[in-house]
C-alpha cells in the first residue's frame, strides 16, 4: 500500500523564512528506512554525502529517543508501516548531516501528490 508522508523542516539549518516549507513523498508502506532516506535525499536535492539517522521522540531536543541508524540498526529491519501509527505525543524525525544539522519532521498525510497534466 502506498502512503503519503509530509516532510517539514523542524530545526537546525532551517531558518524562520522557511517555516512553511514542506515536501510530500509517496512511498510503499513496506519500504525500509534506508529507502525513505533515499527518497528524502531526492526530494530535497541533497547529495547523500553525510551520515543520517531517524528517531522517534516528543521533540527534536528530547533526550529520550528511539534511534534508527547504522550503529543502532533499524534502517533495514523496520518498514515505514511498522512505525506508523506513532505512540501518542511522539513524532518521527530525520537528521541529515551532523555538522549542518538538517532536522526534518515526518508525518503521515492524507493529502496526495498532484500529478502534472501533460500538455
Annotated model-derived regions:
Residues 1-119:
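Short linear regulatory motifs enriched in tryptophan with gly/pro/ser
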